[in-house]
């Protein structure tokens, strides 16, 4: 999955680059954007900054999801610790209760024993009491062993909980380290945004200077046009200057050819330079047509040269002045071309800086993708570890349930046996009461049977209490096991839903990728078609130019009408150019407003990111406080464990004391039996 995500991200980066190139080509082809090419860099930087800022919210969302998962795990571990505490408390209370029951039973039996007054009782009753005491001692030892086993299991569970807590502490430290890294990355993003703002301001300043130069050049062009109109009237008379103008036009044509070759090498500046060259070519063609007309007029005027020699001398002074003005205009045009070349160099530098920034952004995206992959791998490992732990707990609970069920079956068998013995004793008592009191031996048998009944009832009560406790434990264990199974099922369902959503996202991304590839292929085909059309148009234009030159050489008389029409068209073109300048100014103002809006939106996003950072800081502080609380709870749990160990030691001491008392009681019983036998022998002797 990680490799597929990397491939998809790389393909998205490539597609974004292709779309940017297509947007740039579309801007160059748009006729409304011919004179606003310097603003393209600013638009690209703004779009890049917006794209970079749009890439941050999904990362923050994933980070918040990871924090929510960690919070859920914390709550789950806290609940588990509480359940373990409750289980320990129940074990302690059961141990204390069993100890109190044993103590009460032993004390009652010791109090019930006669120390010298019951000489007339039977020896068989003493033997039965001794057996009962021995059975009770065995039961007490079994319960002691069972309590020790419970204590060992509780200690093992506490050790496992401590291990889980240590693992959680390490994960929390890693999480804090990742938070610091993300803060550093956000600081870097803020610095980059500041740099982009500075670059945008510089670009705006350069655009303002460029607009000023363009307006000045337009003013100079208008002045030059006025001067050219005046020079046209003078050129009709000045025949000698026609050859010099033809040489100048040939030099300009050679320069234009060289410029066309340079423009073919530079793809990014091709369209803007072509348009400027076309404008210059149109002006040169106009000049050539006017020069042809002037040549024709010069041929006509050669016949009247003798008449106008005097006027030529007067006009030579004017021609010299016009030549000086032309030379000044040419120098100004050269200066304007140098300024344009400097502006183009600055644009190239800005584009190089933007490419470097894009490379740095791609590196940042790669680092972020690596961080996301590491977080996903950690989450999977945690889920697998929790699954294994729950499976182990479920197996342990099943084993405990089976053991408790076996104990319950054994205790039910003992109860059934006691009930059968009781019924047999009751039947014997009924028989004895029916037969009546015949001998003292029968009376003794009745007392023995009565004592047996009492012992059976006591054992029955004890076994019933134990059965109830065992059933309660079984119910609690079943409830706990069902809850844990339901939790594990919920976790599995959540994981399955997450996997399905990721698969759907991958399919959707692949579909989008195919669509974008198809669109890119269509765009490439369209660009190739447009290039072919442009080449064909250039060829057609060249053919038309050649045919027009031949037609101009043939149709000399129709140029006067065409001159008038061209003057009208020039006026209309001037009006149109003014309208275009106004439209360009409007578009420039609109671009300024849009840049302001984009900067405001970027600032709003930065402020929102700052607020999210503060919220995340508060969240991390809350997590740290929760970790401190968890540490305090662990310390309290350790104290409770020590207290439970002390209680267990006390219980062991009490059990040892009870065993000693039982041993002393057995000795006393043996002494009493010996005394009773002696007394019985003495009574027999006296009777004899």
From Swiss-Prot:
Keywords: Acetylation, Coiled coil, Cytoplasm, Cytoskeleton, Phosphoprotein. Signal peptide: none annotated. The keyword Membrane does not apply. InterPro entries: SCLT1. The modification N-acetylalanine is found at residue 2. Detected in small neurons in dorsal root ganglia. Detected in C-type fibers of sciatic nerve (at protein level). GO terms for biological process: cilium assembly; clustering of voltage-gated sodium channels. Its main location: cytoplasm. One of its GO terms (cellular component) is cytosol. It is found in: Cytoplasm, Cytoskeleton, Microtubule organizing center, Centrosome, Centriole. The modification Phosphoserine is found at residue 681. Residues 59-673 form a coiled coil. One of its GO terms (molecular function) is clathrin binding. Interacts with SCN10A and clathrin. Identified in a complex containing SCN10A, clathrin and SCLT1. Adapter protein that links SCN10A to clathrin. Regulates SCN10A channel activity, possibly by promoting channel internalization. This is Sodium channel and clathrin linker 1. It comes from Rattus norvegicus.
